[in-house]
Amino acid sequence: MATKKKTFEEAIAELETIVEALENGSASLEDSLDMYQKGIELTKLCQDKLQSAEQRMAKVVTEAGEEIPFEADGE
């Protein structure tokens, strides 16, 4: 069975659910560790998707002849 790749929005929604569950503090240590690990995986997925979108946008802007540098907040 093929697994469907998560969209950015699906990953963010799942990450928000995990954060709420961890903040609640009612999960066992083992469940909390599993959720934390899944959260790290989702964070990486979101970062990769954002980086890919940024590269696509930069390519489109460059092809249009209006190169605009991207600046990351807080860096």
From Swiss-Prot:
Which reactions fall under this protein's catalytic activity?
Exonucleolytic cleavage in either 5'- to 3'- or 3'- to 5'-direction to yield nucleoside 5'-phosphates
Protein family per UniProt: Belongs to the XseB family.
How it assembles, according to the record, is: Heterooligomer composed of large and small subunits.
Q: Name one GO biological process term.
A: DNA catabolic process
List the InterPro entries: Exonuc_VII_S (IPR003761), Exonuc_VII_ssu_sf (IPR037004)
Query: Gene3D superfamilies of this UniProt entry?
Result: Exonuclease VII, small subunit
Describe the task this protein carries out.
Bidirectionally degrades single-stranded DNA into large acid-insoluble oligonucleotides, which are then degraded further into small acid-soluble oligonucleotides.
GO terms under cellular component: cytosol; exodeoxyribonuclease VII complex
Q: What's the name of its gene? A: xseB
Q: Does the keyword Hydrolase apply?
A: yes
Broad class of where this protein is predominantly found: cytoplasm
What keywords sit in the KW lines? Cytoplasm, Exonuclease, Hydrolase, Nuclease
Query: Any idea of its EC number?
Result: 3.1.11.6
Q: Name one GO molecular function term.
A: exodeoxyribonuclease VII activity
Q: Does the keyword section mention Nuclease? A: yes
Q: Which domain of life is it from?
A: Bacteria
Q: What is this protein called?
A: Exodeoxyribonuclease 7 small subunit
Q: Which PANTHER family match?
A: EXODEOXYRIBONUCLEASE 7 SMALL SUBUNIT
